[in-house]
Amino acid sequence: MEYILLLVGFILLIKGADFFVEGSSSLAGILKVPSVIIGLTIVAMGTSAPEASVSINAALAGSNDIAISNVVGSNIFNGLVVVGICAFLHSFMPHGEILKRDMPLNILVTVVLCLMFLDGSLSRIEGAVLLFCMIAYLGFMIYSARKNREEGEPGKILSLPRSLLYIAGGLAAVIFGGDLVVDKACIIATNFGVSQNFIGLTIIAIGTSLPELVTSIVATKKGDSGLALGNAIGSNLFNILFILGMSAVISPLHVLGESVIDTVLLLGSAILLFVFARTGRRMTRSEGAACVLLYVAYTAYLFVR
């Protein structure tokens, strides 16, 4: 029964995030909010809503291992699998701003997280620092985007009542689904005698990263593979700065030694992705395949450690 409810939780997370994004984007169109701002805020937060719901629910429940490992595992999955699969399907040239600004920032943020983890905890003050950095980053992105704004085609606009219904229903599904996933994953971990850290790094991390994976594959099939890298990097920054920051502010997180090791491995994957993107300023199919194989090796390492 736990497995069925876990699956139901994942479905609620993914579909809830989809409805939340669609309703929010439609409301923005009704209110004439620039689409670029929606892309940087609502859509980014919507696709990471499953991770946010799981980690924040885990922090409230005192399941620190899941709160941390969900974010670290999701970020490793985004960097290696999401980008890797898209590059394997179709090699692409990363956008200049991502190479010059966002990828180095992603590495820097991961380094800071490693340093914060060294004392074995993520305090409320450290969480507040991460949240402040997220606000500053969003503020800069919005300022930069509005300064150099290029208006695109308006997206699908629903009626106002339907938009509000999508937002409320989607948010409720994400919150309830996140609570269900955390609860059932903890029970399954206990039954099998495996750690919450392992469950968070694998099953939960992959499940909550499905919106990013699906979005990126669809973009690749439409010939816009370069968006895959932007989606992965943007989601990873949001996961660390907002989700871990908010989780720590709600309840200070105890960090296991294994989590420090996993975060160092996350840093390694971020650096590797940057190197691949810089070489020839193109992510090739062979580099994409290498990323996916590295994730398979990492998963095998989790099984045996």
For every predicted segment, state its role:
Residues 1-305:
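Hydrophobic alpha-helical segments, chiefly the membrane-spanning helices
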